[in-house]
A protein has these predicted regions:
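An N-terminal, well-structured beta->alpha segment
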Residues: 1-76, 165-201, 213
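Short, glycine-/Ser/Thr-/acidic-enriched flexible segments
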Residues: 22-24, 29-31, 66, 94-95, ...
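Long, contiguous hydrophobic alpha-helical segments, chiefly transmembrane helices and signal peptides
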Residues: 15-26, 37-38, 45, 94, ...
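Gly/Ser/Thr-enriched, mixed-charge loops and adjacent short helices
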Residues: 6-15, 124-256
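A short acidic (Asp/Glu
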Residues: 70-73, 215-218, 283-285
Length: 286
């Protein structure tokens, strides 16, 4: 009976594509995140892009540190490629705001981020973005949702091999060039560089990426702005989709700061900073 209930839960419905895209447990079944549900969502997105005349513009794809994120990113890319839509895929995990930047920089019609934000490690998800760099909004959200709903036969989802997609010029790896352009733009947002110059060599900052995407870009920005004393929480420094040091990888939760606060006391920090595993939301404990 227990097994039957689990099978029913996995298959009793389709994982719904809403305004936030897909989000669900990773596993087999139509009500789970897996390569087939990712292909279904992407086939619907591809159909919508083609209907909007955006086929030639391409789609940028990023992913976070969660289980299966790189694999799901490639599944989405290869489905797009099989539909004649070029995919620009990051060479490793990146924070979500960089995806928004990349798709505008590259002139893409759409973007995809494989992430489940700060959900528990059993989850993954799929977020769709439009050419303005924001998550899908009317009328595109309902347009894409309708196209995804129309895709009912799992045997009709298009895909192709990575080798064929590359050979056809429909799969391009992106990375350092976008990173450099993105960070250059971020640095332009600084209002008082003179204030950083005055205190940067003395201010002590503790930072934790919470096993997510922020480690490299956040440290790079802080260093290039002139902050000399940045201490990264070692237990949470490297990407890990199991989030072994926290039960809930959300910087708004006090528990997420436990190791950061401990390191902060040890080094007498002036500031403790955390970012969500997928990168966009920094948080500072009061």
């Amino acid at each position: 009976p227990g097994n039957e209930k689990e099978i029913e839960d996995r298959f009793y419905r389709e994982l719904e594509f809403g305004t936030g895209g897909l989000r669900g447990w990773i596993g087999a079944g139509t009500n789970r995140m897996n390569i087939y549900t990712v292909r279904k969502a992407t086939q619907g997105l591809a159909n919508y892009i083609i209907s909007q005349g955006g086929k030639e513009k391409g789609v940028a794809i990023a992913y976070d540190s969660r289980r299966m994120s790189p694999e799901f990113a490639d599944e989405a890319a290869l489905c797009l490629a099989a539909n004649g839509i070029k995919a620009y895929v990051f060479d490793a995990l990146r924070p979500t705001p960089e995806l928004s930047f990349a798709l505008r920089k590259l002139g893409c019609i759409s973007g995809i981020v494989i992430t489940a934000s700060h959900n528990p490690p059993e989850y993954n998800g799929y977020k769709a973005y439009w050419e303005d760099g924001a998550q899908i909004t009317p009328p595109h959200d309902t347009g894409i949702m309708d196209e995804v709903k129309k895709v009912t036969d799992y045997s009709t989802f298009k895909t192709m091999s990575l080798e064929d997609a590359r050979a056809a010029g429909l799969y391009e790896t992106i990375g350092a060039v976008i990173d450099d352009a993105y960070i250059a733009e971020l640095k332009k947002l600084v209002v008082h560089q003179d204030a950083i110059d005055a205190v940067g060599k003395d201010l002590k900052i503790v930072y934790t990426p919470l096993h997510g995407t922020g480690n490299i870009p956040v440290r790079r920005v802080l260093k290039e702005l002139g902050f000399k004393n940045v201490y990264v929480v070692p237990e949470q420094e490297l990407p890990d989709g199991d989030f072994p040091t926290v039960s809930y990888p959300n910087p708004e939760a006090e528990e997420a700061f436990a190791l950061g606060l401990a390191l902060g006391r040890k080094v007498d920090a002036d500031l403790i900073l955390a970012t969500e595993p997928y990168g966009p939301l920094p948080s500072v404990p009061h």
